[in-house]
């Protein structure tokens, strides 16, 4: 091979290695940022396709806070509570201030790391609310200037015009 072809081949190989490394690092970063969503039943029994999360895996779990399950530590901000859907209960441990809408019997989504088969150490807890929720300040302002909206059952279910 003449020197010109060697130089061109070296340049092509360097570009190929660089692009491959970049794509590999991007896929690795995307995989690290991916949190799979589970319900308590799916977490304990596995998803329909048979996959179960491994201990140490980052995930999100959603369900209802079980009444009477909230336990607060008197010396710190740590709170533990149980989340359930229609099946088994999963314990969520959270060290921080819970959202204002957090209540027993309320829907939540927690993001964290699986500690064991039925325990999650959460670093974020989000409280869910229904579509009719309105912050108290906004509701008070609306009362002063607007009449409340009266929805029919069809409209609430999204089937009415």
Swiss-Prot record:
It comes from Aliivibrio fischeri (strain ATCC 700601 / ES114). Its main location: membrane. Belongs to the CcmE/CycJ family. Residues 151-161 have a biased composition (Polar residues). This is Cytochrome c-type biogenesis protein CcmE. One of its GO terms (biological process) is cytochrome complex assembly. The keyword Amino-acid biosynthesis does not apply. NCBIfam families: PRK13165.1, PRK13254.1-1, PRK13254.1-3, PRK13254.1-5. Residues 1-8 are cytoplasmic. The gene is ccmE. Residues 30-161 are periplasmic. InterPro entries: CcmE, CcmE-like_sf, NA-bd_OB-fold. It is found in: Cell inner membrane. Heme chaperone required for the biogenesis of c-type cytochromes. Transiently binds heme delivered by CcmC and transfers the heme to apo-cytochromes in a process facilitated by CcmF and CcmH. Residues 142-161 are annotated as: Disordered. The chain crosses the membrane at residues 9-29.
